[in-house]
């Protein structure tokens, strides 16, 4: 966990304090819906909306949270450079949280995992079996890997992603 956190920091991400996390919660979701004012904005702009001072060069705002319940604003799709980071005590707990996020966020879309796919094939297969998603990305950025092309040549490039029967769609591939 700490190694990943340090790598995020090294790459220009900003970890929010507890107070800053709470302030950003009040900006992410407004009246039960994603706040349109954060969509596509920079991390610096979003932080400013929450009254948080971060360097202009900040790439991503990260809140360390525990809950994956819908009541946790960080557990929603945010369409912006805002991430939740979860610390778990076991692989099983990580998979359970991932399953819940997929369930609440929408079956069929995309899941991703960073793993040594040569030495941890059993773990990878378990992940693939448990995630009810049409795209399971391995060791690639999920936001760009899911749309194909630059980070993933195995998927047709598209900004329209089918979610298959899990998501109530007629197609499961990139359209």
Enumerate the predicted regions with their spans:
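Helix N-cap motif at beta-to-alpha junctions
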Residues: 1-2, 90, 118-119
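Short, flexible turn/loop "capping" segments at secondary-structure junctions
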Residues: 72-79, 103-106
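Terminal or standalone catalytic/regulatory effector modules within metabolic enzymes
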Residues: 101, 105-108, 119-123
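C-terminal segments
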Residues: 6, 10-58, 114-175
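Short, well-ordered beta-strand elements within core beta-sheets of diverse protein domains
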Residues: 79-89, 110-114
